[in-house]
Amino acid sequence: MEQEKRVFSIDVAGRPLVIETGELAKQANGAALVRYGDTVVLSTATASREAKDVDFFPLTVNYEERLYAVGKIPGGFIKREGRPSEKAILASRLIDRPIRPLFAEGFRNEVQVVSMVMSVDQDCSPEVAALIGSSVALTISDIPFEGPIAGVIVGRIDGQFVINPTVEQMEKSDMHLIVAGTKDAINMVEAGADEVPEEVMLEAIMFGHEEVKRLIAFQEEIAAQVGKEKMEVVLYEPDPELEAEIRQLAEADIKKAVQVPEKLARDAAIEDVKAGVIAKYEAEEADEEKLKQVQEILHKLVKEEVRRLITVEKIRPDGRKVDEIRPLSSAVGILPRTHGSGLFTRGQTQVLSVCTLGALGDVQILDGLDLEESKRFMHHYNFPPFSVGETGPMRGPGRREIGHGALGERALEPVVPSEREFPYTIRLVSEVLESNGSTSQASICASTLAMMDAGVPIKAPVAGIAMGLVKNEDHYTILTDIQGIEDHLGDMDFKVAGTRKGVTALQMDIKIKGLTRDILEEALQQARKGRLEILDHMMQTLSEPRKELSKYAPKILIMHINPDKIREVIGPSGKQINKIIDETGVKIDIEQDGTIFISSVDEEANQKAKQIIEDIVREVEVGQVYLGKVKRIEKFGAFVELFNGKDGLVHISELAEERIGKVEDIVSIGDEILVKVTEIDKQGRVNLSRKAVLREQRGAGELPKETREKRGRRPERHRMKP
């Protein structure tokens, strides 16, 4: 049946949000063109007709940036978009997280959601448009999606919450909060904040959810008019008789295995139970399909037992109380040649973070859809396979590593000193050495210690903690400092980072359909208690940033020049500035206001470069005496270089007190002589006098400090006769 174009509109934060269906991408299961202000995003949803032979839900979410959306042509030889940018990867994760919980357990059809950003209005977030567009595409399609969902950005200006703030408003806001959810509950939170109290964050989340409800009602109206009938799918379920058989066979052993306190020993005990059961069925020559069901049933039994222990008996796999943090240890300065290092260990999770300081020219250059062009504070997170005792390929960072790195960066950025206070580029690298849950939060703690060890004057130390949730019907248990098995088998991973004063970052992922205000409030308060405990421990290791930088860190010298002189320092095609860099070995960064940052590990090199720049921008002053070098000789006088690039003429009559016949009788090229500036004419030409200096010094009883072979007349030169 031919689809007709339909247009739906609603006002969001004073700007029209328009949804168009039925015209573009009609072969997808569902498609929606979202116009928010001048931002345009095409979102599509497509699903396979048959279930895939996998033991998970194969959902893929892609957020595709197109540089034509902001009128740019990609750089490089190829001149087309390549791998996704870091921001595109984070946006893909942002859309994936609220959508994924809203598919039925056992649904194994492959689903792909693609959002293409086609036009960007910086005041209207393309990520929000893509999130809403993805929900609309799924909701109006025949894919069995249990939505819709919606999301908004919440800012706070002068104590007032603002929905989807503009770029100008965002600069004044002390938080950047993204809230997504269904009409009944919140199922995704992502935030960066400037030490905002927990109770304010909670109110902001609930404020955002009210707008989410309005947007969901809008989507329900669209679905009622253009939505397709949902396809019938067969949800995967293991054989009930086989499940009862395996439960009888393995349940008692699984109950013992999951309560082994140490991670590796517990994993081994669980695997031994599973291996024994699988061996029994292999001996009976069970087919591949049956063995696959055996694996899934065993996993289900482990999950049920862990959840039962936590919710009913209030017992965690490692024996801790629900609000108890694992044993902590930390150290700083363990890598002697780095600028700063911090090691943070929490139970069997261990992260080593290293801080490197660089010149302002070391900033990361961004080529994306945002107005931002560079980044001077970076946090990178690496997760090698040995951290979980496994082998594996050592590739570049994946979506998870990029997401965890960005979360740490967002948590630490509010306490990083400004460029004026600390004119360095700062790069943090967090190496996960052991993993048993909460590595992203351990990286925040280790990075705080590394910056303090490096002497970065942070405003306050930051710590992070991951909260968990296990919910059965109306009963729930919130867990502090979740470990791997609790994250894997629980319902929530709620990461909270901040200082003693307040929250700097939040990230909430859940596997159930949503959370209520009460659960969020309890989780935030329990997280604060844990965060303060971790901060107390960290302060015992290093209570404040070191007063001095590492001797291996670059030293930065700041000077100011007249902005009109910048072109003289740079020179044609950068010739002058490159010459200074080659001569001294320093790095030089120049700002438009005339501020110059000179950086080098060698302080003497900084001073040398500064002197050269001062000479370049120095102005010749009438009446001043200079020690200059003779550069050129003419019949009428000598041209003398006063300092770098500045010269003047000493007329023959001004070279000596007595009358002379030739310039060469007094000076030669390369001589250093004292001269006085007598005049700068209308054309900018500088007139000099050596005679005036001689008179002044003779009157004072001093000899001129000149580098010459003789003073006064030179002997006549002998020439060979022809």
Curated annotation (Swiss-Prot):
Reactions that this protein is recorded to catalyse: RNA(n+1) + phosphate = RNA(n) + a ribonucleoside 5'-diphosphate
Comp. bias intervals (Basic residues): 710-722
One MF term in the entry's GO annotations: polyribonucleotide nucleotidyltransferase activity
Keywords for this protein: Cytoplasm, Magnesium, Metal-binding, Nucleotidyltransferase, RNA-binding, Transferase
SUPFAM superfamilies named among the record's database cross-references: Eukaryotic type KH-domain (KH-domain type I) (SSF54791), Nucleic acid-binding proteins (SSF50249), Ribonuclease PH domain 2-like (SSF55666), Ribosomal protein S5 domain 2-like (SSF54211)
Pfam families for the chain: KH_1 (PF00013), PNPase (PF03726), RNase_PH (PF01138), RNase_PH_C (PF03725), S1 (PF00575)
Cofactor(s) demanded: Mg(2+)
Coarse class of the protein's main subcellular location: cytoplasm
GO cellular component: cytosol
EC main group: transferase
S1 motif domain residues: 623-691
Protein name: Polyribonucleotide nucleotidyltransferase
Organism: Geobacillus thermodenitrificans (strain NG80-2)
Source taxonomy: Bacteria, Bacillati, Bacillota, Bacilli, Bacillales
